[in-house]
Structures are given as C-alpha cells and as structure tokens.
C-alpha cells in the first residue's frame, strides 16, 4: 500500500510538470481596429479528374488589398476548414489581414481546401474519407490535383502568381507531410512549406523522407517545421523523432529550414499561436527579391 500511495503521489506531483504549455495567441491573431478585412468565399469542388468521385469544400480568402491586375501570391492549406475557421487553431484570415496591413508579408490569397470524401451510394450511408490517400501517399498525385484540378478553378476568378517563390503550402499532421510532398514533387511550382506536427512516419511510407532528403540534391524549398515533445508514438512511428530526423536531414543537405520543438501534443495549439511568426519567416525576403 505504501508503494501505491507513494507512486500516486509521484504521479500527481509529476502531472503539473508535464502539463502542456498554455500557448497564447499574440495580437496578430485577433481582429484590430482600422485593419481592412478580407472576404472569405466558401465553394464546393466535385469534378476532380485526379480523384474521381470525390467532393470537397474549400474556401478562398481574398485580402482587401487584392488587385486583379497583379499576379498575387497564395498559400494552399490542407484540412482547410481548421485553418480558416474564426475559432480554429490558426485563425489564418485574421493573421493575413494584420500582417498584410502591416506590410510584413506580401498580399496573399488563401486557399483552404478540405480532403475529399466519396459520397455513399447507399441511402443514409456514410461517405468514404479520402484524406490519408491524398495526404500520406508519396507521389505526385496530390500535386497534380492542385495544379490540374483545383488551381485552374480558382484562377477563373483570381489572378494567381506563376512564380514558384510566391506559391506556398501549409498543413497539419498528414496535411503537413502532404504540403512537403507537393513541394518535393514540384519545386518548379511551390517553394514554401509550413508543417504543423507533420506525419513523417510510416503511415504510407513517409518515414523514408529523411533518407531521401540526404541522398537527393537539394531542392529550392524553404520549410518551417513545428513539432511537440508530447506528440504521437504509435505503430506508425514516433512523431517527435520523425520530425527531428527531418530537421537533421534538412540541415545536412543545406536546406533553408526552421525547426521549432514545443511540448505540445498532436494538435494545432502551438502551431496556431506561432503562425504569424511562421509567415514572417517563410516570406521574409519575398518583396526584397522582386
């Protein structure tokens, strides 16, 4: 009994120590008086050639400063609803409003796209989720979806830049590895990546990326990796270890990268609160280069 009581006491005293940090949003993640607000348009995409039969919601954020006569930078967010939601983990539209107004980042259109689902053919049946196939697979299929399916649809209404330095990607978990895969497959089209708690584990072979990065000539990609010490450890792999391996491989090969390790779990709390700084870093020299 004494051992049990002692163990319980140790556990109770240890829990506050390992409690996850209470990450706080900065003023950049809240609406500010006098800052022009962009508009958000919700759409549905249901005519994919790359993923036939899928249906997905997506949202377009258009900043107040958008000029249709100028090719405009853009960022594609995987699991888009989580990023665009007013009370989501990132509040990206508000952050865009503030940083664009402060001229800390270029004028950017946000494209927030959800993973596809395949509607059930049975009445009352549940749709089949296509997320892991789209996000965790290591090939060019999702990049082709963006380049051949979705972006041409967006370009019907908006003037998107063709400059790969102005085309960026962001995602969380499987969406994070997806963002990397798109840039890895098509660095001629996308060269900026932000990954929250990226799933560089063996869901569909993503654990191979560190070795691939080390053995492949450096590609012109800039990447920000965020991870948490208390992230997942399961049959697919260990997320903190996988992201450390990614960071080590990027360093070895000479990539322009930044790696931030917090103490968070498998969620967007840490990444969401530092998103403004992620944007500042990823876009830090874009206007100067123009």
Task: Place the predicted regions along the sequence by residue.
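Non-catalytic cap/lid and distal C-terminal segments of serine-dependent acyl enzymes
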Residues: 20-290
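Positively charged n-region of N-terminal signal peptides that target proteins for export
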Residues: 1-5
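Bacterial N-terminal signal peptides
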Residues: 7-16
């Amino acid at each position: 009994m004494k051992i049990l009581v002692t163990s319980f006491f140790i556990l109770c005293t240890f829990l506050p120590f390992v409690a996850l940090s209470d990450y706080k949003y900065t003023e950049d993640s809240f609406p500010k008086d006098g800052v022009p607000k962009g508009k958000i348009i919700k759409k549905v995409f249901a005519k994919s050639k790359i993923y036939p039969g899928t249906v997905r919601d997506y949202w377009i954020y258009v900043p107040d400063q958008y000029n249709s006569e100028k090719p405009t930078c853009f960022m594609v967010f995987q699991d888009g609803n989580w990023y665009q939601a007013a009370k989501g983990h990132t509040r990206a539209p508000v952050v865009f409003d503030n940083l664009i107004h402060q001229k800390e980042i270029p004028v950017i259109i946000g494209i927030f796209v959800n993973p596809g689902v395949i509607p059930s053919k049975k009445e009352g049946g549940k749709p089949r989720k296509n997320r892991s196939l789209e996000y965790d697979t290591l090939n060019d299929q999702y990049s082709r979806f963006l380049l051949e399916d979705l972006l041409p649809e967006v370009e019907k209404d908006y003037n998107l830049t063709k400059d790969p330095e102005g085309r960026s990607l962001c995602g969380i978990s499987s969406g994070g590895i997806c963002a990397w895969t798109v840039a890895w497959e098509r660095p001629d089209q996308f060269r900026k990546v932000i990954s929250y708690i990226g799933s560089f584990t063996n869901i569909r072979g993503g654990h191979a990326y560190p070795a691939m990065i080390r053995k492949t000539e450096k590609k012109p990609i800039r990447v920000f990796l965020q991870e948490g010490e208390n992230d997942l450890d399961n049959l697919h792999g260990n997320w903190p270890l996988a992201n450390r391996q990614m960071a080590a491989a990027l360093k070895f090969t000479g990539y322009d990268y930044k790696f931030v390790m917090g103490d968070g779990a498998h969620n967007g709390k840490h990444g969401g609160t530092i998103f403004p700084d992620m944007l500042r870093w990823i876009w830090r020299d874009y206007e100067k280069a123009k």
